């Protein structure tokens, strides 16, 4: 009888640990989701300080233009005039997938966004800094349906060639 009670007790404790583990993982995803929503909201409301406080001081932002590859301070300088107008940019999340590293210090995600440019895709990395999730890296891309790629590449061919030449000159 004692053996049966011990087995039931052990199974109960094991189940509790498994449930706690999945709840804490879900909780980290919810935290990251909340941070990303707050970041997009800060941009829509032109809240410059809130927006940049969600990023690490050594973060990196890559925009839709091939020349938009900014460190934190350069991105702040680029963004400031947009925020000063009263609304920087308004991105509404359509869907988001979040991944949490086992030690819960890093997270990465991808998202589809409804933007003034149409559907865009965002992706990035967050890390825990003093117990808070901060965006360390973000990439914004315009989503182009495959059937429009040929006309798009034709449209930007000259610009791309000039930019490639500029990037490869030594």
Task: Label each residue range with its predicted role.
Residues 28-47, 160-163:
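Short, aromatic-enriched amphipathic alpha-helices that serve as compact interaction elements
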Residues 1-26:
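Bacterial Sec-dependent N-terminal signal peptides
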């Amino acid at each position: 009888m004692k053996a049966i009670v011990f087995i039931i007790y052990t199974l109960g404790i094991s189940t509790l640990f498994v449930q706690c583990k999945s709840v804490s993982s879900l909780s980290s995803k919810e935290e990251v989701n909340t941070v990303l929503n707050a970041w997009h909201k800060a941009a829509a409301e032109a809240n410059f300080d809130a927006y940049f406080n969600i990023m690490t001081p050594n973060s990196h932002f890559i925009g839709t233009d091939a020349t938009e590859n900014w460190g934190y301070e350069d991105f702040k300088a680029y963004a400031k005039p947009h925020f000063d107008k009263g609304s920087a940019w308004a991105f509404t999340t359509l869907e988001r997938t979040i991944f949490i590293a086992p030690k819960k210090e890093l997270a990465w995600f991808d998202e589809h966004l409804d933007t003034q440019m149409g559907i865009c895709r965002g992706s990035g990395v967050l890390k825990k800094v003093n117990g808070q999730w901060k965006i360390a890296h973000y990439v914004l891309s315009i989503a182009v349906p495959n059937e429009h790629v040929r006309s798009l590449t034709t449209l930007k061919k000259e610009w791309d060639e000039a930019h490639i030449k500029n990037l490869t000159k030594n």
